[in-house]
Each structure stands twice: as structure tokens, then as C-alpha cells.
């Protein structure tokens, strides 16, 4: 690692990348990020010069509106199971016929 990348480091640590491209996050990093195994997610940003910024994906980065909507749907399904119906795939295909959609594209804030 270049010396200038460590100039502001409080602690440095390393981990090895496995043949499958995986690594174990060292304990000091997990502790600093307050990561809970099996619960938390990590956000990565690739910076100029090949450096990567990594942080815990926290509540402040969650979509509170979407979460509220999903809680509403969950409660509605729980309280009114008689109103749930199977999805008709043919009707769904008709709804999107002629649309050019790439499900891998990110949805921007203006959409």
C-alpha cells in the first residue's frame, strides 16, 4: 500500500483474497464499523487512484419511504389475506409489452 494512503490511518490491517475472490473482514475493521455478522451490509466507493472507501451501510442510507410502504403492504397482507390473489403472468406481460427496460439499470432520483 502506498505510504500516502496511510497518512491519516489510525490503524492498518490486512486480509488475504481467496481464490474465489473473497476475504474475511479483519476484527478491528468489523469493530470500527460496528458490523453485526449476518445483519449488516457494506457500501464500497471506488476512488481515483485505485483506492476504495468502505463503510457500513447504515440506517441513514436506507430508503425510509420505501420501508414504510413495505411495512404497510406487510400489515395489509397480514390483516386482509382474503384480498391477496396470485399474479397473472399473462396480464403482467401485456402491461409491459413494448417497454424497453433493463432491470440492471439504476433508477435515478428523478425517476
From Swiss-Prot:
> Where does the protein end up?
Cytoplasm
Q: What does this protein do?
A: Antitoxin component of a type II toxin-antitoxin (TA) system. Labile antitoxin that binds to the YhaV toxin and neutralizes its ribonuclease activity. Also acts as a transcription factor. The YhaV/PrlF complex binds the prlF-yhaV operon, probably negatively regulating its expression.
Q: Which residues form a coiled coil?
A: none
Tell me the null mutant phenotype: Not essential.
NCBIfam families the UniProt entry points to: PRK09974.1 (NF007429)
> Record keywords: Cytoplasm included?
yes
The answer to whether UniProt assigns keyword Transmembrane helix to this entry is no
This protein is called what?
Antitoxin PrlF
Q: Where is the SpoVT-AbrB domain?
A: 12-59
Q: Which UniProt keywords apply?
A: Cytoplasm, DNA-binding, Repressor, Toxin-antitoxin system, Transcription, Transcription regulation
Supply one GO molecular-function term: DNA binding
Taxonomic classification: Bacteria, Pseudomonadati, Pseudomonadota, Gammaproteobacteria, Enterobacterales
Q: Name one GO biological process term.
A: regulation of cell growth
Q: Please name the SUPFAM superfamilies in this protein's record.
A: AbrB/MazE/MraZ-like (SSF89447)
Q: Which gene encodes it?
A: prlF
Q: Gene Ontology cellular component?
A: cytoplasm; toxin-antitoxin complex
- Species name for this entry? Escherichia coli (strain K12)
Q: Which InterPro entries match?
A: PrlF_antitoxin, SpoVT-AbrB_dom, SpoVT-AbrB_sf
Assembly, per entry: Homodimer; forms a complex with YhaV with stoichiometry PrlF(2)-YhaV(4), possibly as a YhaV(2)-PrlF(2)-YhaV(2) complex like the MazFE complex. This complex is seen to dimerize in solution.
Q: Name one Pfam family in it.
A: PrlF_antitoxin
Amino acid at each position: 500500500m502506498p505510504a500516502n494512503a496511510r497518512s491519516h490511518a489510525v490503524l492498518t490491517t490486512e486480509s488475504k483474497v481467496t481464490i474465489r475472490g473473497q476475504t474475511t473482514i479483519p476484527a478491528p475493521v468489523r469493530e470500527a464499523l460496528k458490523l453485526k455478522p449476518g445483519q449488516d451490509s457494506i457500501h464500497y466507493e471506488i476512488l481515483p487512484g485505485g483506492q476504495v472507501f468502505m463503510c457500513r451501510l447504515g440506517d441513514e442510507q436506507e430508503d425510509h419511504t420505501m420501508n414504510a410502504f413495505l411495512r404497510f403492504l406487510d400489515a395489509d397482507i397480514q390483516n386482509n389475506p382474503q384480498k391477496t390473489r396470485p399474479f397473472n403472468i399473462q396480464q403482467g406481460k401485456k402491461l409491459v409489452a413494448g417497454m424497453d427496460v433493463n432491470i440492471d439499470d439504476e433508477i435515478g432520483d428523478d425517476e
